[in-house]
Amino acid sequence: MDWTWRVFCLLAVAPGAHSQVQLVQSGAEVKKPGASVKVSCKASGYTFTSYYMHWVRQAPGQGLEWMGIINPSGGSTSYAQKFQGRVTMTRDTSTSTVYMELSSLRSEDTAVYYCAR
């Protein structure tokens, strides 16, 4: 398990002081192969620009797969090699929202997509 998964798992179970933090994602979508999808994640309850945001996904019957990370402050990104050229992560500081766009969709992209602080 690499550090990104340790961070993700820690955030998933951390109780107490951060219970006011909310990440609200856009709803489910159905897309055809070759299309693109853009998922939003609106943050609240903390200083948006102070924490990096990860995107992960979980395909049916599979484990979590890390896709990439964005720095909401400067907008810099780092993507998993598997998604290079197909994924774009952006942010809008005025609405405390991050976005993940995945293009050239394939059947194997069927998954639940999550943002994680």
Curated annotation (Swiss-Prot):
Where it sits in the cell: the answer is:
Secreted; Cell membrane
Name the Gene3D superfamilies on file: Immunoglobulins
Q: List the disulfide bonds.
A: C41-C115
Highest taxon listed in the record's lineage: Eukaryota
Any one Gene Ontology cellular component term annotated for this protein = immunoglobulin complex
Region listing for Framework-2, in residue ranges: 53-69
Stretches for region Complementarity-determining-2: 70-77
Domain (Ig-like): give its ranges. Answer: 20-117
Q: Where is this region: Complementarity-determining-3?
A: 116-117
Matches recorded under Pfam families = V-set (PF07686)
Sorted alphabetically, which PROSITE patterns does this protein's record hold? IG_LIKE (PS50835)
- Which CDD domains does the record associate with it? IgV_H
Segments for region (Framework-3): 78-115
Where would one find the signal peptide in this protein? 1-19
Instruction: Provide the residue span(s) of the region labelled Framework-1.
Output: 20-44
Keywords of this protein's UniProt record, alphabetized? Adaptive immunity, Cell membrane, Disulfide bond, Immunity, Immunoglobulin, Immunoglobulin domain, Membrane, Secreted, Signal
Which GO BP terms, alphabetically? immune response; immunoglobulin mediated immune response
Q: Where are the transmembrane segments?
A: none
* UniProt-recorded Gene Ontology molecular function terms: antigen binding
Q: Where are the residues of the annotated region Complementarity-determining-1?
A: 45-52
- What does the protein in this record do? V region of the variable domain of immunoglobulin heavy chains that participates in the antigen recognition. Immunoglobulins, also known as antibodies, are membrane-bound or secreted glycoproteins produced by B lymphocytes. In the recognition phase of humoral immunity, the membrane-bound immunoglobulins serve as receptors which, upon binding of a specific antigen, trigger the clonal expansion and differentiation of B lymphocytes into immunoglobulins-secreting plasma cells.
What's the subunit arrangement here? Immunoglobulins are composed of two identical heavy chains and two identical light chains; disulfide-linked.
Name it. Answer: Immunoglobulin heavy variable 1-46
